[in-house]
A protein has these predicted regions:
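Thiamine diphosphate
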Residues: 29-142, 148
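Cofactor-pocket helix-loop regions in the catalytic cores of large enzyme subunits
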Residues: 1-46, 84
Length: 148
C-alpha cells in the first residue's frame, strides 16, 4: 500500500474530531496534501524540514491531553527510529494507548533521494537494517506491529 493510499484510507475512517500528526520525510510530505480539517480537527506537524522524531511524542501528548478523541500519527521508519526513546514512556500503565502508522521503506528516503539527485546516484549511510522490528524491540511496552 502506498503512503498516499494509507493516508486516504485512514483519514476517511476517522471521525471529524480526530487529531492527526506526522513526522518529517517523504512519506509524511505526501500526506501533508491530504488531511482536511472540519469541526475542530487538528493536524500536528513539524513542517517538511522540522525536527526529526516529532511524530511519536506529539501524538503521546495529544492523546494524554484528549483521551476521548482518536489520535493517529504517521512516520517513516527513519524518523520513527529517532523517537525510540519515547517508547519507554508509552509503556506506562496510566497512559492511554496510541496509534502510530510507520511507513517501512528501510531507508532515510529524503536523504537518499537528495544524494542520488545531487551526487550521481552515489549515496552512503541512508539504508536501514531490514531485520529491525520496532515492535519486537519493545513488545514488553505493549507495542504490536501490523503489516500490509
Amino acid at each position: 500500500m502506498s503512503p498516499r493510499m494509507a493516508w486516504r484510507a485512514i483519514q476517511s475512517a476517522l471521525p471529524k474530531d480526530a487529531i492527526i500528526s506526522s513526522d518529517i520525510g517523504n512519506n509524511c510530505a505526501i500526506g501533508n496534501a491530504y488531511p482536511t480539517f472540519e469541526e475542530g480537527r487538528k493536524y500536528l506537524a513539524p513542517g517538511l524540514f522540522g525536527p526529526c522524531g516529532y511524530g511519536l511524542p506529539s501524538i503521546m501528548g495529544a492523546k494524554i491531553g484528549r483521551r476521548d478523541v482518536p489520535v493517529v500519527g504517521f512516520a517513516g521508519d527513519g524518523a520513527f527510529g529517532i523517537s525510540m526513546n519515547e517508547m519507554s514512556a508509552i509503556g506506562r500503565e496510566e497512559w492511554p494507548a496510541i496509534t502510530m502508522v510507520i511507513f517501512r521503506n528501510y531507508q532515510w528516503g529524503a536523504e537518499k533521494r537528495n544524494t542520488t539527485l545531487w551526487f550521481d546516484d552515489n549515496f552512503v549511510g541512508t539504508e536501514l537494517d531490514q531485520q529491525v522490528s520496532y515492535a519486537v524491540s519493545y513488545t514488553h511496552l505493549r507495542a504490536h506491529e501490523t503489516t500490509s
